[in-house]
UniProtKB/Swiss-Prot annotation:
The gene is rps14. Binds 16S rRNA, required for the assembly of 30S particles. PANTHER family: 40S RIBOSOMAL PROTEIN S29. Pfam families: Ribosomal_S14. Its cofactor is Zn(2+). This is Small ribosomal subunit protein uS14. Zn(2+) binds at C19, C22, C37, C40. GO terms for cellular component: cytosolic small ribosomal subunit. One of its GO terms (molecular function) is structural constituent of ribosome. Keywords: Metal-binding, Ribonucleoprotein, Ribosomal protein, RNA-binding, rRNA-binding, Zinc. PROSITE patterns: RIBOSOMAL_S14. It comes from Aeropyrum pernix (strain ATCC 700893 / DSM 11879 / JCM 9820 / NBRC 100138 / K1).
Amino acid sequence: MAKIRPPKPKRMGRGAQRCQRCGTRDAVIQKYGLYLCRQCFREIAPTLGFRKNR
């Protein structure tokens, strides 16, 4: 039987960055070194000092 190697960790592309809070790989905000997904950013943004521009 053949040996199965574990997959290599991704280093480039959309799947390489993960949200530090929930671990999802969709819509990760990397600006300012945040590495949060869109949903987590909306929950945490007021505590970080971000405001809505309206």
